[in-house]
């Protein structure tokens, strides 16, 4: 596991460096092809890490009989539909709660057992950092989901969170107990969200760090399954999500490709994040990481 984590870490840092070098100043709003490419990568490389929930469920809930499968699938689908229902009924409140849950979920990238505040700062800055230099772009993105007034308020509030959060993170990274690789990863993530267009930064982060790291850890946590079962769990649910997304877009009244794609991807990620987090919590995945003592995973 340590070798794979080192490789993933080094690759992410390298990709981030190239992205910062060649992607700084790129306006995705004026480059639809690049925007489309970023969204495609987000779906193809980001969504699969949630597809492993099936294997987590088999290992956790001992799904040997049809009734157990139906109970799990029913609970998972109901949770996803409940998220969508809340979004339709109380969009603004739901969006704020989703951002908070996302920050908490992203904080698990860093397996720093003794630095919970640092982890939370890391997760929060992933959400808030773009507000410093890309406030207009972030407002436009949020306005695709919620009203423009709330979007503006959220972005302005994010600025106030970013400054103290960034200072705390900087001070904590001076700590000698934190490995140099973790410091480089954190710096790379923060640089992406500070200097690149929010969609480009999130696509690189979500695919290269969050999803990739989860896949590697999951591979070792789910050791009872064969490689074929692992690949099947990655491929088939991902295909189903893509088909559902295409169907949703075809049924949409407003077929503005850019807006609808971003909206569908967001709602899809939101709907799947809640049951995904629930499955991970039930599986004691984080507890396993702690007991294995992968402090920095390498």
PLM regions and their residue ranges:
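N-terminal membrane topogenic signal
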Residues: 1-15, 67-69
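Hydrophobic, membrane-inserted alpha-helices
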Residues: 16-21, 74-84, 100-106, 166-168, ...
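Short, hydrophobic transmembrane alpha-helix segments
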Residues: 21-33, 252-256
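Transmembrane helix interruption/hinge and helix-loop junction motifs
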Residues: 27-33, 85-94, 193-202
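Hydrophobic core segments of alpha-helical transmembrane domains in multi-pass membrane proteins
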Residues: 35-44, 91-104, 201-213, 265-269
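C-terminal ends of transmembrane helices
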Residues: 50-60, 100-115, 167-178, 214-222, ...
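Membrane-interface helix-loop-helix junctions at boundaries between adjacent transmembrane segments
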Residues: 59-74, 78-132, 139-149
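Alpha-helical transmembrane segments of multi-pass integral membrane proteins
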Residues: 118-138, 155-172, 185-201, 239-240, ...
